[in-house]
Amino acid sequence: MHFAALAILSSLVASAAAHTRVWGVWVNGVDQGDGRDIYIRSPPTNDPVVNLTDPAMACNVDNRVVPQWVSVKSNDSLTFEWYHNTRDDDIIASSHHGPIAVYVAPAASNGSGPVWVKIFDDTYTTSWAVDRLITAHGQHTVIVPDIPAGDYLFRAEINALHQADVLYDQDPLRGAQFYISCAQITITPGGDETLPAGIALPGAYTDSTPGIVWNLYNGSDPTEYVAPGPPVWTDALGGSIALVGIPVLPNTTSSAGVAPTGAA
């Protein structure tokens, strides 16, 4: 069998048990505890969003206000930690190559309308962003922008490309797979940079958007890949994909969380 066909078959098999979502966040290297349904607007499953017109493109399925908010300051480091089934397993299948992005929006919007501002993305350098995320135990960091104090949604996005050679509209069993989690974050104190106009999700990603269709298996040069969405906001403060701390919470598949402690 041709290598490309084998690779596609392998990705199909792996995708059945390779999904992911965010467990919680770290602030300046301090674990804020299990955030699922506590300060993370956790979806009921770790399945991806594949329909670009689905309202779940904003904050995944079951977007709603959850009980708590994590307190940060402008210029703090905010780290997302992804997981598969438990906190100590591989966070996603190694076949799920692709980029990572982080957006921010005022919480009052509930993620609706042209409110999402991209503050970080990472595609391919010497390896795909997701490959490096696996090595980093699912942890990637953004620096909290110098935006005014208030409540915000920080939206982490993985775009897995292992089935992105075909549009979802052409084959509902395929298409780019978006793993999305939104964290409720309170910035206090804040800064004086005004967020620019954002994009709407759903809406901004369409079948013709660069980065939605990509064939991992036909020899395409990954350094030419362009991530979906706008460029990173020019006043964003950057981020990285790297391990910031070793999880210490008990290994559990329950959705119960503990109160976040905020920045230390």
From Swiss-Prot:
<dbReference type="GO" id="GO:0005576">
    <property type="term" value="C:extracellular region"/>
</dbReference>
<keyword id="KW-0186">Copper</keyword>
<feature type="binding site">
    <location>
        <position position="96"/>
    </location>
    <ligand>
        <name>Cu(2+)</name>
    </ligand>
</feature>
<keyword id="KW-0479">Metal-binding</keyword>
<feature type="glycosylation site" description="N-linked (GlcNAc...) asparagine">
    <location>
        <position position="51"/>
    </location>
</feature>
<keyword id="KW-0503">Monooxygenase</keyword>
<dbReference type="InterPro" id="IPR049892">
    <property type="entry name" value="AA9"/>
</dbReference>
<feature type="glycosylation site" description="N-linked (GlcNAc...) asparagine">
    <location>
        <position position="251"/>
    </location>
</feature>
<comment type="function">
    <text>Lytic polysaccharide monooxygenase (LPMO) that depolymerizes crystalline and amorphous polysaccharides via the oxidation of scissile alpha- or beta-(1-4)-glycosidic bonds, yielding C4 oxidation products. Catalysis by LPMOs requires the reduction of the active-site copper from Cu(II) to Cu(I) by a reducing agent and H(2)O(2) or O(2) as a cosubstrate. Active on cellulose and cello-oligosaccharides, as well as plant cell wall-derived hemicellulosic polysaccharides. Also active on cello-oligosaccharides such as cellohexaose, cellopentaose or cellotetraose.</text>
</comment>
<comment type="similarity">
    <text>Belongs to the polysaccharide monooxygenase AA9 family.</text>
</comment>
<keyword id="KW-0119">Carbohydrate metabolism</keyword>
<keyword id="KW-0732">Signal</keyword>
<feature type="disulfide bond">
    <location>
        <begin position="59"/>
        <end position="182"/>
    </location>
</feature>
<keyword id="KW-1015">Disulfide bond</keyword>
<dbReference type="GO" id="GO:0030245">
    <property type="term" value="P:cellulose catabolic process"/>
</dbReference>
<feature type="glycosylation site" description="N-linked (GlcNAc...) asparagine">
    <location>
        <position position="75"/>
    </location>
</feature>
<dbReference type="Pfam" id="PF03443">
    <property type="entry name" value="AA9"/>
</dbReference>
<feature type="glycosylation site" description="N-linked (GlcNAc...) asparagine">
    <location>
        <position position="218"/>
    </location>
</feature>
<keyword id="KW-0560">Oxidoreductase</keyword>
<keyword id="KW-0624">Polysaccharide degradation</keyword>
<keyword id="KW-0136">Cellulose degradation</keyword>
<dbReference type="GO" id="GO:0004497">
    <property type="term" value="F:monooxygenase activity"/>
</dbReference>
<feature type="binding site">
    <location>
        <position position="19"/>
    </location>
    <ligand>
        <name>Cu(2+)</name>
    </ligand>
</feature>
<dbReference type="GO" id="GO:0046872">
    <property type="term" value="F:metal ion binding"/>
</dbReference>
<feature type="signal peptide">
    <location>
        <begin position="1"/>
        <end position="18"/>
    </location>
</feature>
<protein>
    <recommendedName>
        <fullName>AA9 family lytic polysaccharide monooxygenase A</fullName>
        <ecNumber>1.14.99.56</ecNumber>
    </recommendedName>
</protein>
<keyword id="KW-0325">Glycoprotein</keyword>
<feature type="binding site">
    <location>
        <position position="179"/>
    </location>
    <ligand>
        <name>Cu(2+)</name>
    </ligand>
</feature>
<dbReference type="InterPro" id="IPR005103">
    <property type="entry name" value="AA9_LPMO"/>
</dbReference>
<feature type="binding site">
    <location>
        <position position="162"/>
    </location>
    <ligand>
        <name>O2</name>
    </ligand>
</feature>
<feature type="glycosylation site" description="N-linked (GlcNAc...) asparagine">
    <location>
        <position position="110"/>
    </location>
</feature>
<keyword id="KW-0964">Secreted</keyword>
